[in-house]
């Protein structure tokens, strides 16, 4: 047990899918996993373990923002022996070729947060996903006949940013989606010797102002989840 996770030792699988919303974690567990058990519920940050096609997998919420996800991912890695973390979340698009409900695989993550500079002695840390996990996700998407975008995300500290001109800079530099966690998760994984990947569904478009509903964000986005789950099986067989 930790101050934030009350699961017993051995309760988590070596791979954990992590949405921000704990109710999305519940949805994933109940919809896609078999033999599901709730294993943690501190602060209502729900976590579950079950099996997917016979493979033990866990799913747990990580909350919103880098500080929250950093707590949970660090404790999962150092206290529960988790080896791989796959964030499955939502992002906002700034490029016109990235559409609402498209799936984005974040091979890298830029950020305006200072957390990786703190852990990397005030130098710039290149926050990237694990290559093999990324390739497995791309392979899983192709097997499903899905087109996905692979590239850089931007992990923002502020949801309501006062610097809207930054979106123009992001578009110029080819940022695929804006979210709030990937760079932090990649930093934690690097620091503590784990592997990580972020897969997002575009929930809103910053340019067109299109958006999905809160219910859609909680209860759908199944393509992203299936890509994540199938990528685990592909990784096991690599």
Swiss-Prot record:
Any one GO CC term of the record: cytosol
Gene name per UniProt: deoD
A Gene Ontology biological process term: purine nucleoside catabolic process
Enzyme type, top EC level: transferase
Family in the record: Belongs to the PNP/UDP phosphorylase family.
Catalytic activity: a purine D-ribonucleoside + phosphate = a purine nucleobase + alpha-D-ribose 1-phosphate; a purine 2'-deoxy-D-ribonucleoside + phosphate = a purine nucleobase + 2-deoxy-alpha-D-ribose 1-phosphate
Protein name listed in UniProt: Purine nucleoside phosphorylase DeoD-type
Record InterPro entries: DeoD-type, Nucleoside_phosphorylase_CS, Nucleoside_phosphorylase_d, Nucleoside_phosphorylase_sf
Residues the record lists as binding a purine D-ribonucleoside: 4, 179-181, 203-204
Entry annotation: catalytic residues: 204 (proton donor)
Top-level taxon: Bacteria
Gene Ontology MF term list: purine-nucleoside phosphorylase activity
KW Glycosyltransferase (keyword) present: yes
Pfam name, any one: PNP_UDP_1
Description of how the protein assembles with itself and partners: Homohexamer; trimer of homodimers.
EC annotation from Swiss-Prot or TrEMBL: 2.4.2.1
Keyword Nucleus in record: no
Gene3D superfamilies found in the cross-reference section: Nucleoside phosphorylase domain
Site positions (Important for catalytic activity): 217
Keywords linked to the UniProt accession: Glycosyltransferase, Transferase
Binding site for phosphate: 20, 24, 43, 87-90
General function of this protein: Catalyzes the reversible phosphorolytic breakdown of the N-glycosidic bond in the beta-(deoxy)ribonucleoside molecules, with the formation of the corresponding free purine bases and pentose-1-phosphate.
UniProt cross-references to SUPFAM superfamilies, sorted A to Z: Purine and uridine phosphorylases
